[in-house]
């Protein structure tokens, strides 16, 4: 069979992604990626430590990240992204910048991290006050709050799940419930946006529904990572009815078929997390 008329495959541009060893949401990352871009993933080495500040530090050492980036150079990505929120905020703003520099030196290409992309997205959306949802323990959550505050953004509320493993098993319904708690207007006023932290937390399908209910932009770790990386390629992420990506959704756009003031519709669930989690909380 002569297939010469197809002329393909078409040229692809590459984004290298360094993910933590326990990252389980490869498919979610791809959902933000246009057809002409390919993701090339690698993972940090396994360490026998549960999700904690200790783990965040271990998987974000410059030598570890440099080695991971060098494994990607064979496929010549145009940008590399470190897809880990806690690993990129644990060292603060200065530490995040140093991380990007170390990755760029190793791969000779621009580098982004999830936490750096978060701050970039907050600037893009002109956010001065943000509510946070995390799957982390309180100690990890506090470091995220400090990271955001040092960037000049007020944290109006925060809900955390207290998980130390298998974060990818959290359901969309649980994410939505925690988002509502975090977004409640408190003494610091209403939030301009809501951030769903952790690249292992499923968020893609729940973002537009939460934006329609809460009437503020909702951004997530995987979303901002892909948005920032693709931005450096001069291309756009794919995300219908997501305020960060779709400008028409930045003024409280109602989803097609929804009446004004309607509540969050049913969202699909993903497999539940086992009963091995710490006490949930909010501040």
Give, region by region, the residue ranges found by the protein language model:
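N-terminal glycine-rich anion-binding loop in soluble enzyme alpha/beta folds
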Residues: 1-67, 133-174
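Short, well-structured alpha-helical segments in soluble
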Residues: 61-75, 177-190
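Glycine/small-residue-rich loop that forms an oxyanion/phosphate-binding "nest" at active or ligand-binding sites
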Residues: 69-110
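Periplasmic-binding protein-like
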Residues: 78-83, 131-132, 190-198
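Conserved beta-alpha
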Residues: 99-164, 246-247
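Hydrophobic alpha-helical
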Residues: 181-213, 226
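C-terminal functional extensions of proteins
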Residues: 220-257, 280-283
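Compositionally biased, intrinsically disordered low-complexity segments enriched
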Residues: 253-274
């Amino acid at each position: 069979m002569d297939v010469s008329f197809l002329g393909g495959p078409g040229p692809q541009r590459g984004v290298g992604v360094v993910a933590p060893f326990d990252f389980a949401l490869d498919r979610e990352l791809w959902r933000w990626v246009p057809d002409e871009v390919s993701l090339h993933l690698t993972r940090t080495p396994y360490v026998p430590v549960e999700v904690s500040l200790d783990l965040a530090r271990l998987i974000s050492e410059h030598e570890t990240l440099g080695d991971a980036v060098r494994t990607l150079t064979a496929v010549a990505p145009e940008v590399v992204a470190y897809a880990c929120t806690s690993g990129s905020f644990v060292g603060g703003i200065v530490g995040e910048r140093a991380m990007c520099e170390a990755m760029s030196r190793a791969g000779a290409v621009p580098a982004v991290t999830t936490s750096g992309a978060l701050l970039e997205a907050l600037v893009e959306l002109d956010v001065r006050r943000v509510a946070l949802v995390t799957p982390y323990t309180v100690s990890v959550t506090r470091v995220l709050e400090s990271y955001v505050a040092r960037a000049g953004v007020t944290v109006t509320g925060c809900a955390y799940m207290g998980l130390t493993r298998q974060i990818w098993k959290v359901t969309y319904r649980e994410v939505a419930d925690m988002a509502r708690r975090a977004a409640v207007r408190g003494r610091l006023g209403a939030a301009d946006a809501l951030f769903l932290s952790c690249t292992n937390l499923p968020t893609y399908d729940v973002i537009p529904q939460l934006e329609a209910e809460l009437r503020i932009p909702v951004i997530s770790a995987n979303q901002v990572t892909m948005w920032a990386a693709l931005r450096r390629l001069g291309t756009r992420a794919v995300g219908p009815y997501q305020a960060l990506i779709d400008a028409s959704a930045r003024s409280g756009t109602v989803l097609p078929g929804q009446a004004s003031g309607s509540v969050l519709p049913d969202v699909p669930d993903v497999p539940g997390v086992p009963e091995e989690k710490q006490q949930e909380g909010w501040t």
